[in-house]
Amino acid sequence: MARLRHIAVVVKDLEGAAQFYEKVFDLKRVGEEHLEMGSGIYLSDGVINLALLKYKGESGSGLKDAANFVGAHHFGFQVDDVEATRARIEAAGGKFFFTLGKSKEEANFEVKFKDPDGVIFDISEKGWLGTSK
């Protein structure tokens, strides 16, 4: 069975984005690369790798206007306390986007935010269908 263990997100401010996810979610910096096509900072919670990328141009990215593109659509973090995490997100410069679902006691209930670059992510206490803590 395949398991999701990596997601890559293109950001505007590489160091600022890394500091945001380190501060809010206690992710650890596990690597950094500076290549001709661009740079990357790699963070992890010990299970999944979050690659934050900043491209210099289209080469290697597969994206048109890669130097100006940011994002994947969104990704999510399962947390112990939605309210406490929301406070940490907002204190670090993240902005509330919207809530999806009826009750935080149910799987797939999520609170969506935008990080300082505008990348959408969500938090959930129960996680998502097919996931476990």
Question: At which residue positions do the language-model features occur?
Answer:
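Short, charged/polar surface micro-motifs in flexible loops or helix N-caps
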Residues: G46-L50, G57-S59, V82-A84
